[in-house]
């Protein structure tokens, strides 16, 4: 009797494993994307996608004191960075605050995260909006600025150095 229970247990385990494998084979794979953000004192650092289909990401660096937002993309051919992007967010933040009718504090408090975006990309242009965005929020006012990298897949593929500005894609108060 005890021997039959042990054998039945193995049979059910085998049936369950086979059923799980069969169902798992029918369900399409779901890609997972992980990005990182960290801060210390008045500096924030984040990683985010540029062209996630190609596995390319950028490093973003925000200096809270100066409002300087910089991004860099690692070269795929040599050691070092291949592309650099920068913008000072203060002018964009001031313009968004004026539109929202709010006063900016003397000491802005920033938060920064990255994410995937689905922006229409025309094929004719050399520079396309990246597939990722950097979101910078000012915590006192609720204003969020969204920046994208003007991405050139051709420049990256040929390891051509790039120095350009980040593009303000959207801004609003929440």
Task: Go through the PLM ranges and name each one.
Residues 1-11:
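N-terminal positive-inside, membrane-proximal cytosolic segments immediately preceding the first
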Residues 6-8, 171-174:
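N-terminal low-complexity/intrinsically disordered pre-sequences and tails
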Residues 9-25:
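Hydrophobic membrane-insertion alpha-helices, especially the h-region
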Residues 24-35, 76-113:
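A low-complexity, Ser/Thr/Gly/Pro-enriched, surface-exposed linker/loop concept
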Residues 38-66, 117-141:
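Short, low-complexity cationic-aromatic patches
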Residues 45, 59, 70-72, 112, ...:
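A compositionally biased, intrinsically disordered/low-complexity signal enriched
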Residues 64-94, 140-172:
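Extended intrinsically disordered, low-complexity coil regions enriched in Ser, Thr, Gly, Ala
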Residues 93-143, 149:
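Short, solvent-exposed interaction modules
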